[in-house]
């Protein structure tokens, strides 16, 4: 079987590329060994946001009296929350399959193996292709911890399918995944402890705002162990005992459940990638150019596999750029304004440079910061809740970075990223008319 384009991996990069190329008239074959949609749709972005929304509804009901609404009884049915999550995922997976079918994409459900730059094997079948996009994503990284193999610990996948609310939970890793699950389970009344090796949670976000978010959760009862390394775990009758060190101090913490969420690593083995002899970066990921083309002409690498930005929305844009290059259209990938969002309650979002990055690079900047209370809409909808809008501005008044704490940061960060991508100056925000009242009006107040 011969195709103009073969795509390995049906996650955000893979299905985006397949749909685009099919729509452009190319014959496309897409290989996916699990469910189309990848980790993001099936066990990542969408499932977690479905759970987090349920937790937010639960929080709203619990604290409804602040807004003059009396709710007598509030309880969470985790089984029903998980069932709804499954329904949402199934609906979106079917939607993607329908779009692929509409563009005449051949979807092969099975493990693909790359034999060379123009040949892919799946089972007993061989598929020839003129060009190839490889986007196999990433997998959960589990660090070597003494005793870990002997305890019934969770990964994010287990946490997403668990139907019983534990009494207590220790989360190893205070990154995006760890903090989102901390937010979810804390909202359901679970006693949560977060263990983080670094001196602050959410390493890639603005340090000041990350600290404010952590302080908010501390007030609500979440415990954080920073600068802390887990050295061993032991299964006990009533749960799991976690041994840890903080400096010279050794201690233990016990919980009913343990969630390991220290990060993810690109999937680079098991599908014949080595047969392509691709050039790698110093970090061991696949090296690509601004068109996402690897060192082998006609072979493109998108998403987590190239290691540049392990985010679903980055993968989607990379796929668009790769397909445009295949079609002979002018386009190039820019990582200048890739937004990052952590969907805790409240949300925290970031785009562009952080203060830490600018300081490392020796760049001159100033900070323009306002409390979210400058927005009437924010005050109306957030009783007793604080938020921050922080903008980093260069010597020429160009916007270098925007960092937000407070709902709905995930929606506001979009326009901030557009300003950074287009190299706009801070004063240019005042040229736009914002609907009133909206939280986004705060940008005009800067």
Task: Indicate residue ranges for each PLM-predicted region.
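Glycine-rich flavin
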Residues: 2-3, 19-26, 31-165, 193, ...
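Gly/Ala-rich phosphate-binding loop of Rossmann-like dinucleotide-binding domains
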Residues: 18, 22, 182, 186-187
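Short glycine-/small-residue-rich Rossmann-like dinucleotide-binding loops
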Residues: 11, 32, 137-138, 246, ...
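Core beta-strand elements of the Rossmann-like FAD/NAD(P) dinucleotide-binding domain
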Residues: 1-3, 123-131, 248-257, 295
């Amino acid at each position: 079987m011969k195709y103009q384009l073969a795509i390995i991996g049906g996650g955000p990069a893979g299905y985006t590329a397949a749909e685009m190329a099919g729509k452009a008239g190319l014959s496309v074959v897409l290989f996916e060994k699990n469910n189309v949609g990848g980790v993001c749709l099936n066990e990542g972005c969408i499932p977690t946001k479905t759970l987090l929304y349920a937790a937010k509804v639960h929080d709203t009901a619990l604290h409804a009296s602040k807004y003059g609404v009396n709710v007598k009884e509030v309880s969470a049915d985790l089984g029903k929350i998980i069932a709804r999550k499954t329904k949402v995922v199934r609906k979106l997976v079917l939607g993607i399959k329908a779009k692929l079918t509409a563009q005449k994409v051949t979807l092969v459900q099975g493990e693909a193996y790359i034999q060379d730059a123009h040949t892919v094997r799946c089972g007993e079948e061989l598929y020839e292709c003129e060009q190839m996009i490889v986007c196999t994503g990433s997998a959960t990284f589990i660090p070597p911890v003494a005793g870990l193999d002997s305890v019934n610990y969770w990964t994010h996948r287990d946490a997403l399918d668990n139907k019983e609310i534990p009494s207590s939970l220790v989360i190893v890793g205070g990154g995006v995944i760890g903090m989102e699950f901390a937010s979810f389970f804390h909202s359901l009344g679970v006693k949560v402890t977060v263990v983080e090796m670094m001196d602050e949670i959410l390493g890639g976000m603005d340090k000041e705002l990350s600290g404010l978010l952590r302080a908010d959760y501390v007030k609500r009862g979440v415990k954080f162990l920073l600068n802390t390394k887990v050295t061993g775990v032991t299964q006990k009758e009533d749960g799991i005992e976690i041994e840890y060190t903080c400096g010279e101090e050794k201690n233990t913490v016990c919980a009913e459940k343990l969630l390991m969420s220290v990060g993810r690593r690109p999937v680079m083995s098991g599908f014949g990638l080595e047969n392509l002899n691709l050039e790698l970066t110093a970090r061991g990921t696949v090296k690509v150019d601004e068109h996402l083309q690897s060192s082998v002409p006609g072979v493109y690498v998108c998403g987590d596999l190239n290691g540049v930005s392990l985010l679903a929305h980055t993968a989607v844009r990379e796929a668009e750029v790769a397909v445009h290059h295949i079609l002979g259209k002018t386009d190039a990938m820019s990582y200048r304004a890739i937004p990052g969002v952590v969907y805790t309650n409240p949300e925290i979002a970031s785009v562009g440079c952080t203060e830490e990055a600018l300081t490392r690079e020796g760049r001159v900047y100033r900070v323009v910061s306002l409390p979210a209370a400058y927005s009437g809409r924010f005050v109306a909808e957030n009783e007793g809740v604080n938020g921050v809008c922080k903008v980093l501005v260069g010597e020429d008044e160009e916007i270098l970075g925007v960092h937000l704490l407070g709902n709905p940061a995930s929606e506001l960060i979009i326009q901030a990223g557009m300003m950074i991508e287009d190299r706009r100056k801070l004063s240019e925000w005042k040229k736009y008319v914002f609907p009133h009242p909206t939280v986004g009006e705060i940008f005009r107040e800067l």
